[in-house]
Amino acid sequence: VRMGQGCVVVAQSGVAGSTELSDFVVLAAQSGVSGHLKIAPGTQLAARSGIMRDTEPGAKLAGNPAIPAKEYFRQMAVLGKLAKDRHRKN
């Protein structure tokens, strides 16, 4: 594993072998990165998320497998609405 300058790796995060973390990468708590990847500069990974592919510079990712954070949170909002609608009487 290689780490660039200014990286932040929070508790219980894992990085598999031969992975390269570029400068200013942030891995939040309980996140993971699979092996043989190049994590681009400025990438941010949300807690409890996992990266399976190389990233683009400045990417903000969430989920497992990781997707753009904005898309991930939209999906979670839709799932919440579906759950509420399921219990609503017609």
Where are these regions (language model features)?
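Structural signal for interior beta-strand "rungs" in well-ordered beta-sheet cores
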Residues: 1-68
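Terminal amphipathic alpha-helical/low-complexity segments used for targeting or macromolecular assembly
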Residues: 59, 64-90
